[in-house]
């Protein structure tokens, strides 16, 4: 779906649509979608908005302030800054009601693998990120080594300096 054609985006939503996913700077054209308008469409349909802010970086753009519910980043690129470590970031804005729509039983219904917990009741606005921590990380074992964590931390500490230099050079 062309993110610049808001009517097309609205028309593409079906009963089985789970979320609206977009990038702050689209790959490969670096196009910039109207996140506020797309978020309004998603809210009209009761859908969460997931924004990949890898190229926007948290230093330059904060999608949650523009209606995103979840923001993801590839930490390998600008956050790490050196391409030395693989990593990712998930930010849950706590703005979406996961129980209301009935589309996400894995969060809103009892989870038998986690003592019957309903993440929407146990974690409230943090239900999604709590599910990620409790279930997804448990099941996939996704974790980074201490050295890679150190490298990503170094990149984070210099993010503002590097992005300011990028901006000066544009």
Where are the regions that the model predicts?
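Conserved PLP-enzyme active-site core in the AAT-like
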Residues: 1-170
């Amino acid at each position: 779906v062309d993110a610049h054609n808001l009517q097309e985006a609205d028309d593409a939503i079906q009963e089985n649509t789970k979320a609206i996913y977009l990038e702050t700077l689209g790959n490969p054209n670096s196009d910039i979608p109207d996140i506020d308008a797309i978020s309004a469409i998603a809210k009209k349909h009761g859908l969460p908005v997931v924004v990949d802010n890898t190229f926007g970086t948290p230093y330059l753009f904060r999608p949650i302030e523009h209606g995103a519910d979840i923001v993801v980043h590839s930490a390998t690129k600008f956050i790490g800054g050196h391409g030395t470590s693989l990593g990712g970031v998930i930010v849950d804005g706590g703005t979406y009601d996961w129980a209301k729509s009935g589309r996400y039983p894995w969060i809103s219904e009892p989870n038998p693998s986690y003592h019957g917990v309903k993440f929407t009741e146990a974690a409230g606005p943090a239900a999604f990120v709590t599910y990620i921590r409790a279930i997804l990380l448990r099941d996939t074992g996704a974790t980074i080594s201490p050295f890679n964590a150190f490298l990503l931390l170094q990149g984070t500490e210099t993010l503002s300096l590097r992005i300011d230099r990028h901006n000066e050079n544009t």
